[in-house]
Amino acid sequence: MARMRVMVRERIDGVRPDTLWFLSHPPVYTVGKRTPPEHRPLAGLGIPVHETNRGGLLTYHAPGQLVGYVMCHIGAMNAVVPFLRLLEARLVDTVEALGIPAERRDTPPGSVELTGVWTRRTNRKIASIGLRCTRKVTSHGFALNVDCDMRPWTWATPCGMPEVEMTSVQRELTDAGHAVPSMAEVREIAAEMLGARNAPHPPAPNLSSGDLGTGTRAGRT
């Protein structure tokens, strides 16, 4: 988180271009600012719970999950929701490029937010999104389940939805009888769909044209 905060400050100060940082975390639950206590995992599971300042509720990170932190200057604070919808669309493109029919969903009035990416064939959630915006620069980002251990998802309430079934690229493709790509292959497809490549400082993303902006991949750790 400290490194992400440095990147955000650099983007605010104009010394860093829009950046997509791929990484993975050791097993950890992270909770957004509005996560109720009853959605947290029971004590004694051996998996830490980390408080964050992002939007969204509880999510789980682990090896085998592709996490992408997105530090983008979006031009205006009221562009956060359009940017989030654009990010969802690019992740849908990523999942479909892997051979899994996918979709984003609109949230009905009064419902828990359905932000993220869902599988159309099996009605499961495969990617989660949680963003924060500081002085027109986004932080945090998304998590795409590739081949991680899915059991810890059942030990808490993911995304505020007790009934949701989480899934992974591995599960969906294996169940359909297809080969499972490596993490490196998934990473390259995600980078392509998100428009991440080494580039000079870009303009703010053109939300009306569906452009996330020309980003730089900050590497993977």
Curated annotation (Swiss-Prot):
Stated name of the protein: Octanoyltransferase
Active site: C159 (acyl-thioester intermediate)
GO cellular component: cytoplasm
Pfam family for this entry, one: LplA-B_cat
Keyword Zinc: no
Source species of the chain: Frankia casuarinae (strain DSM 45818 / CECT 9043 / HFP020203 / CcI3)
Location in the cell: Cytoplasm
Residues binding substrate: R54, G55, G56, L57, L58, T59, Y60, H61, S128, I129, G130, G141, F142, A143
Gene that encodes the chain: lipB
Lineage: Bacteria, Bacillati, Actinomycetota, Actinomycetes, Frankiales
